[in-house]
Amino acid sequence: MHIPRNVTALALAAIFLLGGCASRGPVPTFYDFGPAAPMATVPESTPPVPVLVIADANGPSWLDSQRMYYRLLYADAQQSRPYAYNRWNTPPLQLLSQRLKTRVAQSGVKVLSTTDAAAGMPLLRIDVDDFSQNFDTQTQSSGHVSLRASLFRGHRLIDQKTFSRSGPAGSADAQGGAQALAAASDAIASDLLVWLGTLTIPKE
């Protein structure tokens, strides 16, 4: 029996389409920090400047991708592993930069980017050392954030401090890790505001 060419072509196309659908893996799930809630407590001392330039955070290259990483401290603490089907919707360096800027702005300080700043304005630089979910056991994990903050006026270093925060994850999965890392980032933002409030920034 003769089969028309157009019917054959359609059948082949359907086979390829079905084969492509069957070969696809699970659809990735994307996470972020969620909306920035109002600050639970207002720092007793506010930053000593009305305007602060905050540069985007720097960090290792693996934090400049959307992959979510975790460590099995009970098995091999030196190895970081990516989740197979879970992603950040924005690289962690960008997520952390935006959350810190939001928290500083909530304290009443006007926040500018480096492209909008005038010469001589106080500049805050952030260098991120770690941003990962750490498993102590197969069922217990925490989110850990560690960074170094440096405050400059012109080319002069005013002060520098390292901040580190950890918080328990509500579940031993990527969702729990995302929530714990968001909470740890908020805690560091609060610590950062307290530190800024203790500094004396000389005038130009």
Regions found by a protein language model. Give the residues of each.
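Bacterial N-terminal signal peptides that target proteins for export
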Residues: 1-10
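Soluble periplasmic/extracytoplasmic beta-strand elements of cell-envelope proteins
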Residues: 51-56, 71, 123-128, 144-150, ...
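Structured, soluble extracytoplasmic/luminal domains of envelope-associated proteins
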Residues: 83-108
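Sec-exported extracytoplasmic/periplasmic mature domains
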Residues: 101, 105-109, 193-201
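Short secondary-structure boundary motifs at beta->alpha junctions and helix caps
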Residues: 69, 76-87, 156-194
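C-terminal motif of bacterial Sec signal peptides marking the signal peptidase cleavage site
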Residues: 17-20
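A structural "domain/chain start" motif
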Residues: 22-92, 199-204
